[in-house]
Curated annotation (Swiss-Prot):
The record marks T152, K190 as: Transition state stabilizer. It is found in: Nucleus. Residues 86-244 form the FCP1 homology domain. This is Carboxy-terminal domain RNA polymerase II polypeptide A small phosphatase 1. Its EC number is 3.1.3.16. Residues 1-33 are annotated as: Disordered. Preferentially catalyzes the dephosphorylation of 'Ser-5' within the tandem 7 residue repeats in the C-terminal domain (CTD) of the largest RNA polymerase II subunit POLR2A. Negatively regulates RNA polymerase II transcription, possibly by controlling the transition from initiation/capping to processive transcript elongation. Recruited by REST to neuronal genes that contain RE-1 elements, leading to neuronal gene silencing in non-neuronal cells. Mg(2+) binds at D96, D98, N207. It comes from the Eukaryota. Keywords: Acetylation, Hydrolase, Magnesium, Metal-binding, Nucleus, Protein phosphatase. It comes from Homo sapiens (Human).
């Protein structure tokens, strides 16, 4: 595979600029030097340089004919299995990885929390991973409050071992990777309707608005994180998630103006 497509993330410049998805084609073509190719390949969740649409997924939503009847077809297969008994009454929270919980780089970092070996085209590369401040307490508490699902546009060969080391408490009931995204207008989008959960009881935490463009009313936005060890975003979000964990319908809260918005 092209070594420029394994990790999906955005740069600091892109985070400060107009809202774009991670790996947006225009920014990738005009701003990213070739040295970032491997990084873009591993983490990049949003764009495919060839512009090729993803193949149809078995979890695609049912099509509805003009008269409202559902055409006969194979029963839909959702991305998630049925919720476990302990999670049956909990809201499902989809949580992003790169620039939300961690930041990764192929450039050596002295204070890396994890070093992940990733094979690309027969060559093993070391990926240096920094944990966002307060991520441990955040995941521990989120796992108690919600049915948590890791959903990243990065490839599993990178994201799976990162999640193994990051999630000490088994907060993530499931992990979804790039192949579970929908390719839409140059971005990898996380289509929440394919999860198999009531959308009134689904949240998504992601630093990229392009990732939840299909369901913006389900989103709890989070600022992109790179290396600021004084960051308190995850800690500051916990009281809001505590509130959301007690509602019957997330729209009753998320469709209301939030302080500072």
């Amino acid at each position: 595979m092209d070594s420029s497509a394994v990790i999906t993330q955005i740069s600091k410049e892109e985070a400060r600029g107009p809202l774009r998805g991670k790996g947006d084609q225009k920014s990738a073509a005009s701003q990213k030097p070739r040295s970032r190719g491997i990084l873009h390949s591993l983490f990049c969740c949003v764009c495919r340089d060839d512009g090729e649409a993803l193949p149809a997924h078995s979890g695609a939503p049912l099509l509805v004919e003009e008269n409202g009847a559902i055409p006969k077809q194979t029963p839909v297969q959702y991305l998630l299995p049925e919720a476990k008994a302990q999670d049956s009454d909990k809201i499902c929270v989809v949580i992003d990885l790169d620039e939300t919980l961690v930041h990764s780089s192929f450039k050596p970092v002295n204070n890396a929390d994890f070093i992940i070996p990733v094979e690309i085209d027969g060559v093993v590369h070391q990926v240096y991973v920094l944990k966002r401040p307060h991520v441990d307490e955040f995941l521990q508490r989120m796992g108690e409050l919600f049915e948590c699902v890791l959903f990243t546009a990065s490839l599993a060969k990178y994201a799976d071992p990162v999640a193994d080391l990051l999630d000490k408490w088994g907060a993530f009931r499931a992990r979804l990777f790039r192949e579970s995204c929908v390719f839409h207008r140059g971005n990898y989008v996380k289509d929440l309707s394919r999860l198999g959960r009531d959308l009134r009881r689904v949240l998504i935490l992601d630093n990229s608005p392009a990732s939840y463009v299909f369901h913006p009313d389900n989103a709890v936005p989070v600022a992109s994180w790179f290396d600021n060890m004084s960051d308190t975003e995850l800690h500051d979000l916990l009281p809001f998630f505590e509130q959301l964990s007690r509602v019957d319908d997330v729209y009753s809260v998320l469709r209301q103006p939030r302080p500072g918005s």
